Curated annotation (Swiss-Prot):
Listed transmembrane segments: none
Species of provenance: Prochlorococcus marinus (strain MIT 9301)
Function description: This protein binds to 23S rRNA in the presence of protein L20.
InterPro entries assigned to the protein according to its UniProt record, in alphabetical order: bL21-like, bL21-like_sf, Ribosomal_bL21, Ribosomal_bL21_CS
GO annotation terms (biological process): translation
MF term (GO), any: structural constituent of ribosome
One Pfam match: Ribosomal_L21p
Official protein name in the record: Large ribosomal subunit protein bL21
């Protein structure tokens, strides 16, 4: 009896690089060259948008988990179009009363295409200087016994 192990090289190309990012109060799993419908963004078509709230980033063999965000990670998106979602009907009624209310809602959406997922230094360190403040300690006062 022979032991044959199946190789794990049959994984798809899309699982090599992905990121989980936060936008519009939701978390999305972003992959390069895919499009996503997110809540309406204030941008025109063909505009470039950069998401910096990256929660997790996986690149081939390494996984970076943010606390809460991954440092210097960016996702670059391109706005493809603006559209509206399907209509949702809401019907309210009170039984045994003549109160009925039928309302509808269509969510405004923006379709975006993921152009790139990068991690690296975005700004030089000189722009984000931290000032060091020295604490002055008071000497302990000696109690005199008179």
């Amino acid at each position: 009896m022979t032991n044959s192990k199946k190789s794990s090289n049959n994984s798809s190309k899309s699982s090599e690089l992905y990121a989980i990012a936060e936008t519009s109060g939701q978390q999305f799993w972003f992959e390069v060259d895919r499009y996503y419908d997110i809540d309406r963004l204030n941008a025109k078509e063909k505009d470039k948008i950069t998401l910096e709230k990256v929660l997790l980033l996986k690149d081939k063999d390494s996984i970076s988990v943010g606390k809460p965000y991954v440092k210097d990670a960016k996702i670059e998106l391109e706005v493809v179009s603006h559209k509206r979602d399907k209509k949702i009907l809401v019907y309210k009624m009170r039984p045994k009363k003549k109160t009925r209310r039928k309302m509808g809602h269509r969510q405004e959406l923006t379709r975006v295409m993921v152009k790139s997922i990068t991690i690296g230094k975005s700004a030089p360190k000189s722009s984000s200087k931290k000032e060091t403040v020295k604490k002055e300690t008071k000497p302990k006062s000696e109690k005199s016994t008179n």
